[in-house]
């Protein structure tokens, strides 16, 4: 089943990099094959990723915070998730929207924000109200894997 997501977005150019700044609902992030996190396990010689291994305790702390915020209506997560694809995304400059067809684009690589994504996923599994929670997302397009790795290093060391 194809799901197409249409969201308002701002086109951002930074040198050679093209980004779309938008927001996604947690339910969008949970679409099968929507994202992948390429981790590097130092104990696995065949592992070719670049992300640190997931710290489940850190993700759970975020999940607990988001769930608590559903009751008080004050959950706040302003820090964006940085995703990337080596493909292009359709952008409509007339109405400033992007169209994401995950069957043709996906999965997005999570360059920065794997603990936020996992925490949101954990929260949604416990409280379905979280599915409608929106999070800021920056999506880089036409970005090869090696460039994604470089951006991960820049974001996490600069």
Stretches found by the model and what they are:
Residues 1-77, 85-92, 97-99:
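N-terminal extension/subdomain marker
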Residues 51, 74-79, 83, 87-158:
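Basic- and aromatic-enriched surface patches that contact anionic nucleotides/nucleic acids
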């Amino acid at each position: 089943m194809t799901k197409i997501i249409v969201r308002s977005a701002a086109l951002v150019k930074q040198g050679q990099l093209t980004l779309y700044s938008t927001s996604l609902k947690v339910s969008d992030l949970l679409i099968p094959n929507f994202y992948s996190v390429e981790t590097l396990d130092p104990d696995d010689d065949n592992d070719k990723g670049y992300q640190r291994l997931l710290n489940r305790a850190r993700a759970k702390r975020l999940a607990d915070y988001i769930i608590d915020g559903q009751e008080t209506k004050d959950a706040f997560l302003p820090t964006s998730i940085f995703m990337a694809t080596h493909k292009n995304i359709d952008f409509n400059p007339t109405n400033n929207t992007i169209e994401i067809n995950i069957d043709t684009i996906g999965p997005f690589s999570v360059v920065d924000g794997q603990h936020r994504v996992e925490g949101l996923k954990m929260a949604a599994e416990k409280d379905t109200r979280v599915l409608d929670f929106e999070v800021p997302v920056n999506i880089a397009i036409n970005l090869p894997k090696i460039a994604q790795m470089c951006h991960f290093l820049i974001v996490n060391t600069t």
